[in-house]
């Protein structure tokens, strides 16, 4: 049986730590002038994949 290949798009979007999978925030690319400083600051912090999606992301990353 051939080796499983990592989904390259997923590899660029997720980082795997000890127990959690880190992801980037949405709503941070453009047209940020309408958004308050507080909202932008909160979106800057680390985000983690929800537990319902962890298995699917791990499968894409071959973990």
Curated annotation (Swiss-Prot):
A Pfam family reported for this protein in Swiss-Prot or TrEMBL: Ribosomal_L35p
Source organism, top-level taxon: Bacteria
A Gene Ontology BP annotation from the UniProt entry: translation
Plastid among keywords: no
A GO term, aspect molecular function: structural constituent of ribosome
Keyword tags: Ribonucleoprotein, Ribosomal protein
GO terms for cellular component: cytosolic large ribosomal subunit
SUPFAM superfamilies: L35p-like (SSF143034)
PROSITE patterns: RIBOSOMAL_L35 (PS00936)
InterPro entries: Ribosomal_bL35 (IPR001706), Ribosomal_bL35-like (IPR021137), Ribosomal_bL35_CS (IPR018265), Ribosomal_bL35_sf (IPR037229)
HAMAP family attached to this UniProt entry: Ribosomal_bL35 (MF_00514)
PANTHER family per record: 54S RIBOSOMAL PROTEIN BL35M, LARGE RIBOSOMAL SUBUNIT PROTEIN BL35M
Family: Belongs to the bacterial ribosomal protein bL35 family.
UniProt cross-references to NCBIfam families, sorted A to Z: rpmI_bact
Protein's name in the database: Large ribosomal subunit protein bL35
Species assigned in the record: Campylobacter hominis (strain ATCC BAA-381 / DSM 21671 / CCUG 45161 / LMG 19568 / NCTC 13146 / CH001A)
């Amino acid at each position: 049986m051939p080796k499983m290949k990592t989904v390259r798009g997923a590899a660029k979007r997720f980082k795997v730590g000890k127990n959690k999978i880190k992801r980037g925030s949405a709503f941070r690319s453009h047209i940020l002038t309408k958004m308050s400083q507080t909202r932008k600051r909160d979106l800057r912090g680390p985000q983690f994949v929800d537990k319902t999606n962890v298995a699917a992301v791990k499968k894409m990353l071959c973990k």
